[in-house]
Amino acid sequence: ERQIAYAVKNKFKEIKGQEIDIGKEYLEKLIQYPIRIPRLNSKEMEFYMICLLLQKKLDTEKFAELIDYLNEQKREKFLDFDVDYELLINFDKDIADNTRDEINIAKQLSPILSAGLNGNPRQCKRFLNSLSMREKMASFRNVELDRKILAKIMLLEYFKPVLFETISSNLDDKGRSSHIREIENNDFQNNKEYEDDSWVKNWIDVEPSLAEKDLTKY
């Protein structure tokens, strides 16, 4: 809405003598029933991510059946509903076995994505699309990536680009980062600006640990 209002203001001159916000007036004429996308909390973000990831994994008919099953389970177990292996195995064992990675990724990322994106589902979908694109590009180059490591690295790139650049430009000859090792050990001597940064500390707690990983290809 802000982008459209800004574009209208730049296109059309204000009417002299009239205190009219031309951008706002235009939007009110154009959009009769504005729909606000609600923010998602951590559990809602997790479920949303699981649905997006499984949609890419399953054919249309099977995905629709799974969504019906999950919605039914959600109604029955509203307060303690959780999508996990045990829930999926009751639906289809093959699907449960083949989607473990997707479920784990959603559980890994949802808390920090929910906080970092303020529960915005559109930006969450954009992040997952970027993750998928990175994987496809790596596959095209015959490079095998660990999705959990890639996702964690992308979180840093997305939310803390300065720290990401510091880490990526200072890898040792084995592709390891001394900055990550220090931060994982709660040593902020060389990264004092992040000592009280709750986001960075939450990011460090996300599995897997990266201190001894070769990050060169990420």
Predicted regions, residues:
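Conserved P-loop NTPase catalytic core
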Residues: 13-58
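Sensor-1/coupling segment of RecA-like P-loop NTPase cores
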Residues: 1-18
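The feature marks long, low-complexity, polar/acidic/proline-rich intrinsically disordered regions embedded
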Residues: 39-218
